[in-house]
């Protein structure tokens, strides 16, 4: 969370338009996110800058569970098809909607 915050602060200080996302949903564990040493950091993150998905993996797993991966037993990273679909269906519309492009 500290790295996310520092990155957001730097980009905003430099007036750089940006968006963020995660490969997997790293924010779902409420026990961790509500821990006193984490909660105050979590509450400072500007989640409006994040893509409206849980993570790249979860989005592909839900929308392209077969075509979006080469072999889930060996690699959880989306393949080229999965990345292209995520870019076309999520990233580009998000960039347009938020006047980033």
What annotation goes with each model-predicted range?
Residues 1-101:
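Alpha-helical cap/lid subdomain in secreted, periplasmic
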């Amino acid at each position: 969370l500290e790295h996310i915050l520092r990155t957001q602060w730097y980009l905003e200080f430099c007036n750089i338009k940006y968006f963020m996302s995660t490969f997997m949903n790293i924010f779902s564990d409420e026990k961790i996110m509500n821990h006193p040493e984490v909660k105050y950091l979590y509450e400072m993150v500007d989640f409006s800058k994040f893509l409206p998905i849980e993570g790249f993996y979860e989005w592909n797993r839900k929308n392209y569970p077969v075509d979006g991966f080469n072999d889930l037993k060996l690699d959880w990273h989306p393949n080229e098809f999965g990345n292209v679909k995520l870019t076309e269906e999520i990233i580009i519309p998000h960039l347009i909607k938020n006047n980033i492009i």
